[in-house]
């Protein structure tokens, strides 16, 4: 399931809801990706820009609990076709999903539906790789990273602790991604320093003349 792409994970406390009706059975809905929402990653703030999902690979996306790749997926979206047990829609606000849960035959699905209904689980998370980014306020101690394009969404999870990044898969997969983002930030800061150096050189030459 893991790829050679540098995958990142974002855990967010956006609402996830449990619903039930005679036509669709038991399902949960939620919005794992929200455009223009500022998230404190630690070394920087991060914003997923509007339109970042326009060209994203959503061909095969699983739905899990706490990114546990050792468990059977509770749902899956294949090319987002009508027969998929997870439906994904991208709109002006980001991404919304609808997950049909087989509560009769899958104990984990039944437990998740109950936990969401009770409010014990309220957050969603997604694993993704970045295709485009930009930075602002790179000369400050807490810059802002804009994710302008998401290359692929690999999976979406209902998460127990939406405000933290503590699962084992994050420890394995997030380190390289964070290192890459930090390298990108340092590159932007180096460019800024070079611009300032050239400006200073021009000022000195002007004063001499």
For each predicted feature, which ranges?
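Signature of dsDNA virion morphogenesis modules
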Residues: 1-183
């Amino acid at each position: 399931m893991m790829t050679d792409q540098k995958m990142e994970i974002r855990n967010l406390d956006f609402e996830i809801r449990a619903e039930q009706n005679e036509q669709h059975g038991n399902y949960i809905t939620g919005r794992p990706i929200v455009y223009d929402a500022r998230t404190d990653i630690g070394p920087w703030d991060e914003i997923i820009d509007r339109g970042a999902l326009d060209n994203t690979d959503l061909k095969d996306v699983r739905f899990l609990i706490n990114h546990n790749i050792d468990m059977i997926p509770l749902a899956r979206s294949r090319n987002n076709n009508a027969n998929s047990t997870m439906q994904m829609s991208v709109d002006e606000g980001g991404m919304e999903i609808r997950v049909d849960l087989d509560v009769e035959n899958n104990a984990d699905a039944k437990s998740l539906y109950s936990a969401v209904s009770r409010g014990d689980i309220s957050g969603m998370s997604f694993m993704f790789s970045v295709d485009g980014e930009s930075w602002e306020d790179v000369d400050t101690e807490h810059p802002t990273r804009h994710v302008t394009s998401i290359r692929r969404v690999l999976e979406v999870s209902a998460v127990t602790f939406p405000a933290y990044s503590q699962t084992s898969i994050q420890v394995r997969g997030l380190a390289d991604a964070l290192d890459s983002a930090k390298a990108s930030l340092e590159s932007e800061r180096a460019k800024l320093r070079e611009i300032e150096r050239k400006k200073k050189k021009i000022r000195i030459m002007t004063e001499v003349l």
